[in-house]
Amino acid sequence: VALQEKKTMDMDISNIAHDIRTPLTVASGYAQQSLRSSREDDMAMEKISKNLLTVSKRLEALLEYRRLTEGAIQPQFQDLDFSQLVVKSILPYYDMFQEKGITLDIQVTPDIQCEMDPDIFERLFQNIISNVLKHGKTQAQLTLQKKDDGIYLSVSNMVQQPIQHLDQLTTRFYSENLSDTEDSSGLGLYITEHLVQVLEGELHLAYENE
């Protein structure tokens, strides 16, 4: 069983290494083109920057994936004001939502206390918001409320493309072409779900046709 798991992991790493190699090759090509040019090629430099950013994101996802599979992520719970943490976490993304033309409605019930690892929460929250910015359009909503059976953090958004297989979105390396401009490594929601589980929570996905 252990050998089979190792083979599966090696195959997964090979797949994402291929995904990393492609944008890196593109970036390298444009870099060489710019060096040969007698003047600064702004468009080429922009493409270099975009592809190197893609490489950086996929390497980060791969490292996070390895830490999860090796059981290296252990939560350090502390009592805190979860409402404040959520507001603090969303504020840095405000300008990005404006740039994307997405109106974000924030409804956070104040003074919700809980035990939480803020660092792990920041990582999974970044994955969720990045997903909204990448695949969303027009409108999005973030709500935090406390009910009798637990604390509920909900993020909803309109999507650029219809979702075909909702039940597979958290599957390792599965991705759908939900963005008009960006592709995906297929690790974002897989990592997010497992980080939520590390925090002893549950992740639920839902989709409604417009």
Residue positions per predicted region:
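Conserved catalytic submotifs in the C-terminal HATPase_c
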Residues: 78, 103-112
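Conserved micro-motifs of the catalytic ATP-binding
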Residues: 71-75, 113-116
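A residue-level detector for a conserved hydrophobic packing site
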Residues: 121-125
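Short beta-strand/loop element within the Bergerat-fold HATPase_c
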Residues: 139-149
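Short helix-loop "hinge" at the ATP-lid/N-box region of the Bergerat-fold HATPase_c
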Residues: 131-133
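Short conserved segment of the HATPase_c
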Residues: 161-174
